UniProtKB/Swiss-Prot annotation:
Subunit of the oligosaccharyl transferase (OST) complex that catalyzes the initial transfer of a defined glycan (Glc(3)Man(9)GlcNAc(2) in eukaryotes) from the lipid carrier dolichol-pyrophosphate to an asparagine residue within an Asn-X-Ser/Thr consensus motif in nascent polypeptide chains, the first step in protein N-glycosylation. N-glycosylation occurs cotranslationally and the complex associates with the Sec61 complex at the channel-forming translocon complex that mediates protein translocation across the endoplasmic reticulum (ER). All subunits are required for a maximal enzyme activity. Residues 49-56 are cytoplasmic. This is Dolichyl-diphosphooligosaccharide--protein glycosyltransferase subunit OST5. It comes from the Eukaryota. It comes from Saccharomyces cerevisiae (strain ATCC 204508 / S288c) (Baker's yeast). The gene is OST5. Present with 1010 molecules/cell in log phase SD medium.
């Protein structure tokens, strides 16, 4: 591809509009961290409850999956706010 083709393609393409702006991502990272800690700590409390083993396993699995999803989102938001764009 020649420079002229690349230049023409660059200027004819649509400008990129981010879904979540970079200036709000640190706020989402902090909120995600709080939610992650709350959900994962409630998963640990669910294990210590006096209910049946199957019920504890079910609640622990659900809460740990939700906590892991929030931990992943928090990692992406935190790394983007430090300038490592994921």
């Amino acid at each position: 591809m020649t420079y002229e083709q690349l230049y023409k393609e660059f200027h004819s393409s649509k400008s990129f509009q981010p879904f979540i702006h970079l200036d709000t991502q640190p706020k989402f990272a902090i909120c995600g961290l709080i939610v992650t800690l709350a959900v994962l700590s409630s998963a640990l409390f669910a294990v210590g409850s006096k209910s049946s083993y199957i019920k504890k396993l079910f609640f622990y699995t659900i809460l740990s999956v939700i906590g892991s999803l929030f931990a992943g989102l928090t990692t992406v938001f935190a790394s983007n706010s430090f300038g490592v764009y994921v």
